From Swiss-Prot:
It comes from Borrelia garinii subsp. bavariensis (strain ATCC BAA-2496 / DSM 23469 / PBi). It is found in: Cytoplasm. It is an enzyme of class 2 (transferase). The record marks 181, 242 as: Transition state stabilizer. PANTHER family: ACETATE KINASE, ACETATE KINASE-RELATED. Pathway: Metabolic intermediate biosynthesis; acetyl-CoA biosynthesis; acetyl-CoA from acetate: step 1/2. GO terms for cellular component: cytoplasm. Its EC number is 2.7.2.1. The active site is at 149 (proton donor/acceptor). CDD domains: ASKHA_NBD_AcK_PK. Keywords: ATP-binding, Cytoplasm, Kinase, Magnesium, Metal-binding, Nucleotide-binding, Transferase. Mg(2+). Can also accept Mn(2+). The gene is ackA. This is Acetate kinase.
Amino acid sequence: MKILIINTGSSSLKFAIYQYENSKKLISGVIEKIKEQKSIIKIINTDGSITERFEKGIENHPKAIEKMFKILLNSNSKILKNISEIKIIGHRVVHGGSYFKNSVILKNSNLDKLKQSSKLAPLHNPSAIAAIETVLKILPHAKQVLCFDTSWHQTIKKHAFLYATPYSWYKEHNIRKYGFHGLSYSYVTKRSSEILNKKIDNLNLIILHLGNGASINAVKDGKSYDTSMGITPLEGLVMGTRSGDIDPSIINLMSTILNKNTKQIEEILNKESGILGISEKSNDMRDIWNKIEEGEYQSKLAVEIMTYRVKKYIGSYIAILDFNVDAIVFTGGIGVVDYEVRELALKGFEKIGIELDLEKNKMAQNKNLESEISTIKSKVKILAIPTNEESTILEDIYNLIPKNL
């Protein structure tokens, strides 16, 4: 019996097959550039080998789901003899709104509530819903489990999640901070507890999930206490293509200046801003560092703006945790690999006893390795931990659907 895990992005579809009885990963893959002229399909086998090919553009997520099942059935690894071997499907869903405080087994009522939440995540939830409905048609008798990035942050208190807007906006329209990257933060919190040999209930962390999308999470007593992303993933840190925090008046101002509607301006803030917007070169940090080596000013400025924002958030989260922090933890593609970003983000904190070991930090560039990168005398541990959202989804699946099914 097999478990299929699906992670839909706005233009991508990640998937993995696990053996139900022992949680062993059998195969994984990703379909990228959905809705574009050429799509990319990558298959990652258990031996680490990768096969990659280009195909004529896959037009939408339902077609991508159909393609995924064909790939799994036709794989040289013979993982599946029959599609009916898949009995459970776990979905990563970005936004659960106010409805979902935990992962749930799919029911019609849950799907209706998820559709209602889509207005809060128009860039992310529609693709997840399309995947869920397509799987429902192909495997109608399989159990589907919905795992939400927002659920982890349901422990944030009202004074931290409310915006200072009319209270009726919250009561009538659920306008509030929700936060994201929750599956990642849940995993990293558990791993930090194991590494530090400290019970989760007594654990205070500042976790930075730094990738093309980026956020920061204050964890108090093992639970989410505050986070930088808001009602959507646009708020907070400077990201690959997202602006992060801005004065909201800019939206109407630039709408008038550029003669664009507010939806178009929001699209620019989501897809043409951040590192890409400032550098006018790339949203890929590898490209940015290359441009900096060439002496390119705007790329250097983009990194300065990004790491300055990160440093501000770290400082404020140290304060709200009452200066009682067990570890600062970096995760995500940039957080685990980019030692220069870590160094810039933590520069100056040695004055309050948070000391980065520069040599250890420089050595920690492997996306698959956990590292402790603080000095021996640092009052706060500094860690780099690769995230594993699939592990959190698997754990939630087994909690909802026991192994003696």
